């Protein structure tokens, strides 16, 4: 099996890192060889696999050593649960420099040091927020990741971010091989959430590859710096991540998405009763103005 490179995008705080780590733990359980590359200055993309607060990042260690050329692969590549290989790109101090540059530096370093040659089945890039510009787009722009999965929910801004990410995918898909693999709905228990995300995926020309229900066992596992797969393998939530993993292994529906307009997104929310036309009449009105009206 050829190595598959997948990037996980989505709105900040939507649960990308948690979803990614539980997903790769399930893939490891299936006997897959996996590497996670954290592309976020917070360096929290591998903590549940390594049981650590935060992994030392390539950018931190390069600063200490002098340059990235002074690093060895074993300095930055750690192995955790299920023999999952873990790397964090890191970034500059807050307010200084471009964090996206860290992603570029990290991926180039990993390639030069042969990190991708270890008979891997999957590489997952866990990418900061919904930023698809500059360095954070590198997994897409440089054809590193061929499959993009977008984590979202039935909340308007999560859907808005997913649509924006699809616009970024289109930009690079036309000149490369990157494709959208599907939407992963990380439930926030909003009304008709699964139907809504399936409808959004359909409009984007894609699929909701899996609906991950909300369950407090995820938080209980996170407090222990563990995935649900490791913390409570018999939990129903662990089976949800296993199902997601199997669907990604078997996924053949890789598309160039068809992003929609803001008007179309609002129309979709109205169709599902999340917004109604009355909402449009109150846009820009203060509480006092609404009382007068």
From Swiss-Prot:
Q: What does the UniProt cofactor note say? A: Binds 1 [4Fe-4S] cluster per dimer.
Q: Which HAMAP family match?
A: NifH
* Similarity-based family: Belongs to the NifH/BchL/ChlL family.
The biological processes this protein is annotated with in GO are: nitrogen fixation
Sum up the protein's function in the record's words: The key enzymatic reactions in nitrogen fixation are catalyzed by the nitrogenase complex, which has 2 components: the iron protein and the molybdenum-iron protein.
Listed GO molecular functions? Answer: 4 iron, 4 sulfur cluster binding; ATP binding; metal ion binding; nitrogenase activity
Enzyme Commission number, as recorded: 1.18.6.1
What name appears for this protein in its UniProt entry? Nitrogenase iron protein
Species this protein is from:
Stutzerimonas stutzeri (strain A1501) (Pseudomonas stutzeri)
